[in-house]
Curated annotation (Swiss-Prot):
SUPFAM superfamilies: Crambin-like. Thionins are small plant proteins which are toxic to animal cells. They seem to exert their toxic effect at the level of the cell membrane. Their precise function is not known. Keywords: Disulfide bond, Plant defense, Secreted, Toxin. GO terms for molecular function: toxin activity. This is Viscotoxin-1-PS. The keyword Disulfide bond applies. GO terms for biological process: defense response. Disulfide bonds join C3-C40, C4-C32, C16-C26. Belongs to the plant thionin (TC 1.C.44) family. It is found in: Secreted. One of its GO terms (cellular component) is extracellular region. It comes from the Eukaryota.
Length: 46
């Protein structure tokens, strides 16, 4: 599960993933976090 700080971060993450980037790389460049929990800590959920 990915958690992003805002909609812009989510858009960057999704675009990166669509382009073939790994979850880790896309999370790093977008400011998102990859977590194992089912809910995001004070981040918008997707």
């Amino acid at each position: 599960k990915s958690c992003c700080p805002b909609t812009t971060g989510r858009b960057i993450y999704b675009t990166c993933r669509f382009g073939g980037g790994s979850r880790z790389v896309c999370a790093r460049i977008s400011g998102c976090k990859i977590i194992s929990a089912s809910t995001c800590p004070s981040y918008p959920b997707k």
